[in-house]
């Protein structure tokens, strides 16, 4: 695995995590 795909994988993980956090927060937690 090269550095570019590794960076994209980390970016997608952070994006998905923050997005789910926002949705979870708006749900009224």
Swiss-Prot record:
- Transmembrane ranges, per UniProt, are 3-23
Under InterPro entries, the record lists:
Cytochr_b6-f_cplx_su8_sf, Cytochrome_b6-f_cplx_su8
Kindly give the membrane topology term recorded for this protein: Single-pass membrane protein
Keywords on record:
Chloroplast, Electron transport, Membrane, Photosynthesis, Plastid, Thylakoid, Transmembrane, Transmembrane helix, Transport
The GO cellular component terms are: chloroplast thylakoid membrane; cytochrome b6f complex
Does the record's keyword annotation contain Manganese?
A: no
Q: Which Pfam families match?
A: PetN (PF03742)
Query: One GO biological process from the UniProt record?
Result: photosynthesis
Localization recorded for this chain is: Plastid, Chloroplast thylakoid membrane
Q: Which GO terms describe its molecular function?
A: electron transporter, transferring electrons within cytochrome b6/f complex of photosystem II activity
What does this protein's UniProt record list under function? Component of the cytochrome b6-f complex, which mediates electron transfer between photosystem II (PSII) and photosystem I (PSI), cyclic electron flow around PSI, and state transitions.
Assembly and binders? The 4 large subunits of the cytochrome b6-f complex are cytochrome b6, subunit IV (17 kDa polypeptide, PetD), cytochrome f and the Rieske protein, while the 4 small subunits are PetG, PetL, PetM and PetN. The complex functions as a dimer.
Q: Which family does it belong to?
A: Belongs to the PetN family.
Its name, as the record gives it, is: Cytochrome b6-f complex subunit 8
């Amino acid at each position: 695995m090269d550095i570019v795909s590794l960076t994209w994988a980390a970016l997608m993980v952070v994006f998905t995590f923050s997005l789910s956090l926002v949705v979870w927060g708006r749900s009224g937690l």
